[in-house]
From Swiss-Prot:
Gene Ontology biological-process entries: brain morphogenesis; cell division; chiasma assembly; embryo development ending in birth or egg hatching; engulfment of apoptotic cell; establishment of mitotic spindle orientation; germ cell development; locomotion
WD repeats: 104-145, 146-185, 189-228, 231-270, 273-327, 330-369, 372-404
Recorded name of the encoding gene: lis-1
Protein source organism: Caenorhabditis elegans
UniProt-listed SMART domains: LisH (SM00667), WD40 (SM00320)
Protein name listed in UniProt: Lissencephaly-1 homolog
Classification of source organism: Eukaryota, Metazoa, Ecdysozoa, Nematoda, Chromadorea
Subunit structure: Component of a dynein-regulating complex composed of at least lis-1 and nud-2. Interacts with nud-2; the interaction is direct.
Family: Belongs to the WD repeat LIS1/nudF family.
Positions with biased composition (Basic and acidic residues): 69-89
Expression sites (tissue/organ): Expressed in all classes of neurons in the ventral cord. Expressed in the multinucleate spermathecal valves and adult seam cells.
Pfam families given in the database record: LisH_PAC1 (PF24951), WD40 (PF00400)
UniProt keyword list: Cell cycle, Cell division, Centromere, Chromosome, Coiled coil, Cytoplasm, Cytoskeleton, Developmental protein, Differentiation, Kinetochore, Microtubule, Mitosis, Neurogenesis, Nucleus, Oogenesis, Repeat, Transport, WD repeat
């Protein structure tokens, strides 16, 4: 395939601009002479040669991904397994191999999250940084620096415009997300490592949990702590807010899960059935209620909470009664993260046994186990509208898994 004269001229101009901008003065002069260009012909092209090179690399990655997916689909067809086209969206689950392996962090990954609107995700690490990635191409978009110790948790508000992070440096930071990526504010008040953070649904408050045994509510506009929740007697590992925004749950090393009311600013329930520290909690989406309970929801009775523990178990709780609905057992080490399929049929869990497991909630069984990483798997997230799951590990990598 030959190039037209116009295409040749465009390529020559792009090469000349690259040489000129990168200090290849002698080569630049020779190239102008041999290509019959003059310096007047070299107009600013905005680094088009580098952009085209980057585009080629991205396209090559996508070609490789498509080839992998084609091979996987062919294997499924050969073995009689249903292809993605034959499955309903509610039945799509993560399947190996991963579509992307993201490397760049220098210490273990502590949290991964999806942006609610764009095809990007964020990861944070014990290396004190937050990284922003395009999860479809695997491209690192940006690194946020500002913390001076491990970043333990991150969250993005519902509008996708702000990110909040918390750290072992005792601070919480608010970041612009999408425009400048600048740190907008630092919130200080905890007396020990800040381990978990999340936005309230309204977006004007942030909730944080700490190794100082407390949970704090912060006003974003002022940066001040407006309330401190006390009740745990050990490190609070994770906090999660209910889907309707009326309650939140906290998991602690004191082996309990506490459910708190925003209205009364007090504990509604203390859940005690785990035999070791509780690492994670996650509220089941309303779509999961029937799969979890076998009943149709009545009124506001859809508060179902799941917890994962160092005792290797996952428990489902009825928050109206405080009872354990059932316990899921299959992991061989600490359970570190939970995420629900948006359609409510499956629960995804990750653990220090290096696996990602898919649980069918209606049958209360582990239907699939994936050897996800080479070391402990510390975090997992399920995209709410696209068929992707991401995991992060102590092996310093994040992986993107397509659901099909």
């Amino acid at each position: 395939m030959s190039l037209s004269e116009r295409q040749k001229e465009e390529i020559n101009r792009a090469i000349a601009e690259y040489m000129q901008n990168n200090g290849y003065s002698e080569s630049f002069s020779v190239f102008l002479k041999e290509s019959s260009l003059s310096e007047n012909d070299i107009k600013p092209l905005g680094g088009i040669l580098e952009k085209k090179w980057t585009t080629v690399l991205r396209l090559q990655r996508k070609v490789n991904d498509l080839e992998s997916k084609l091979q996987e689909s062919q294997r499924e067809i050969n073995h009689g397994a249903p292809t993605r086209d034959k499955r309903q969206a509610a039945d799509w689950i993560p399947r190996p191999p991963e579509t992307q392996k993201l490397t760049g962090h220098r210490l273990p990954i502590t949290r991964v999250i999806f942006h609610p609107l764009w095809t990007i995700m964020a990861s944070c690490s014990e290396d004190a940084t937050i990284k922003v990635w395009d999860y479809e191409t695997g491209q690192l978009e940006r690194t946020l620096k500002g913390h001076t110790d491990a970043v333990n948790d991150i969250a993005i508000d519902a509008a996708g415009k702000q990110l909040v992070s918390c750290s072992s440096d005792l601070s919480i930071k608010l970041w612009d997300f999408g425009q400048t990526y600048d740190c907008l504010k630092s919130l200080k008040g905890h007396e020990h490592t800040v381990s978990s953070v999340t936005f309230l649904p309204t977006g004007d408050f942030v909730l944080s949990a700490s190794r100082d045994h407390t949970i704090k509510q912060w006003d974003i506009s002022t940066g001040y702590c407006v309330y401190t929740f006390r009740g745990h007697n050990d490190w609070v590992r994770m906090i999660r807010i209910s889907n309707d925004g009326t309650l939140f749950a906290s998991a602690s090393l004191d082996q309990t899960v506490t459910v708190w009311s925003f209205a009364t600013k007090s504990a509604k329930l203390v859940l005690r059935d785990h035999e070791h520290a509780v690492e994670c909690v996650e509220w089941a989406p309303d779509t999961a209620y029937t799969n979890v309970t076998g009943q149709q929801p009545e009124g506001n009775s859809t508060h179902i909470l799941f917890s994962g523990s160092r005792d290797r178990s996952i428990k489902a709780w009825n928050i109206n009664t405080g009872d354990v609905l059932f316990t899921l057992l299959a992991h061989e080490n600490w359970v570190r993260g939970l995420a629900f399929h948006p359609k409510g049929k499956y629960l995804i869990s990750v653990a220090d046994d290096k696996t990602l497991r898919v649980w069918e909630l209606s049958a209360q069984r582990c239907m699939k186990a994936i050897e996800a990483h080479e070391h402990f798997v510390s975090t997992v997230a399920f995209h709410q509208t696209s068929p992707f799951v991401i995991t992060g590990s102590v092996d310093m990598s994040c992986k993107v898994w397509e659901c099909r």
